[in-house]
Each structure stands twice: as structure tokens, then as C-alpha cells.
Amino acid sequence: MELLKDKIKKEGRVTEDNILMVDSFLNHQMDVEFFNEVGKEFKDRFKNDQIDKILTIESTGIGLGIITAQYFDNVPVVFGKKIERLPRNKREEVFNSEVYSFTKKTIYNVVVDKKFIKPGEKILIVDDFLANACAVFGLIDVVKQAGAEVVGVGIVIEKGFQSGRAHLEDKGIRVESLVTIDKIEDGEVYFK
């Protein structure tokens, strides 16, 4: 997606430790016009698939999910909540998956209320970044617990130098990334 590459080149910044920051348009301040283009692109890539719901994870994924849903006949958007500890009295009410965050070096629970994903539903997962796929696997686990089906995973920015895609494809999961970064080196972003 050339628009996304241009946004990254113009508005993205690379920190001293080679981390790409896209907070000016994606994951802090959200560029709604750009998000609409993302939604259209995901629709184009999954146009031949039945999508009953979009599943994402808080917080950046919520905006992406809502706008993307408009291009899939306004299907509902469900988001996994990140919590440190699952209260005992909630365990029977939710689907829960433990996820390791490489960014924060901690384990958290992704929870979705059982009433929001039903057996047999066709689910499209969307998220802002794909690195090691830990968050995506947490969402896939939630979908499986519900007896639903993952149609595919839509990713805005894939870190192609990390193993997320390979892990997902090894499990037969379709991955559609709008842009793939080959490497980040000396403050520069290189695309595949």
C-alpha cells in the first residue's frame, strides 16, 4: 500500500534503538482519512470471504476495527480487553488467553465476553502491527474457544524481520499485511 509507505516515510520516526513510531497517524493520534483507506484495502483483500465479525485488541485496534467494519456491511466489532489478572468470578463468563508482550516484557490476559463470539461465526482479526504474533495468537485462541472460525488476519504494518507471519502461516492462518518492513537500520525504514 503506497499510501502507507508514504505516511511512514513522511510522518513516522525511528527512535535511537530502531523502533518505528507511527503515533502521529496510527496508534496515538488516528488519521481518520487514512484509516478509511486501510478499511477499503482490507475489504479489497477479503472481498470474497464471508465476515460476520471483526475481532481486534485494545486500544489501537478499536479504531481500525470500527472503520474497517463499515466496508464489511457494518458487521460488529469485538475487541479483546487486556487485563493483568482475571478475577475468579469472571472466568465462566469470558474467553481468556494469556499473551506475552515483548514490548512491555509482561504477560497479560486477553478477554472477550462469551456472548460476543458465537460458534460458527466467521471472524476477521485486524491489528496495527505484526511482530512475533503473540497478540494475534491470543485472539485466535479466543476464536477457537468460541467455536468460531478465523477467516484471516489483516495487519497494517508487518515487521518482516520478525517471525510472526511464519508462525501464523505454519498454522494455516491467512495473513494480509498492508506493508511489510524488511529492516530498520540507522534510523531508516526499508520495505519489502
Curated annotation (Swiss-Prot):
- Domain of life assignment: Bacteria
Q: Which compartments is it annotated to reside in?
A: Cytoplasm
Alphabetical list of PANTHER family matching this protein: HYPOXANTHINE/GUANINE PHOSPHORIBOSYLTRANSFERASE, XANTHINE PHOSPHORIBOSYLTRANSFERASE
* Amino acids binding 5-phospho-alpha-D-ribose 1-diphosphate: 131-135
Per the UniProt record, the source organism is Clostridium perfringens (strain 13 / Type A)
- List the InterPro entries: PRibTrfase_dom, PRTase-like, Pur/Pyrimidine_PRTase, Xanthine_PRibTrfase
Principal subcellular localization: cytoplasm
Name the record gives this protein: Xanthine phosphoribosyltransferase 2
The EC number(s) this enzyme carries: 2.4.2.22
Q: Which GO terms describe its cellular component?
A: cytoplasm
The upper taxonomy is:
Bacteria, Bacillati, Bacillota, Clostridia, Eubacteriales
User: To which protein family does this belong?
Assistant: Belongs to the purine/pyrimidine phosphoribosyltransferase family. Xpt subfamily.
Q: What is its biological role?
A: Converts the preformed base xanthine, a product of nucleic acid breakdown, to xanthosine 5'-monophosphate (XMP), so it can be reused for RNA or DNA synthesis.
Q: A Pfam family this protein belongs to?
A: Pribosyltran
Task: Specify the pathway.
Answer: Purine metabolism; XMP biosynthesis via salvage pathway; XMP from xanthine: step 1/1
Subunit composition and interactions? Homodimer.
Gene3D superfamilies with a match to the protein in the record: 3.40.50.2020
- Cystine connections: none
The keyword Transmembrane is annotated on this UniProt entry? no
Major enzyme class: transferase
**The entry's keywords:** Cytoplasm, Glycosyltransferase, Purine salvage, Transferase
Care to name a GO molecular-function term for this sequence?
xanthine phosphoribosyltransferase activity
Could you say which residues bind xanthine here?
20, 27, 159
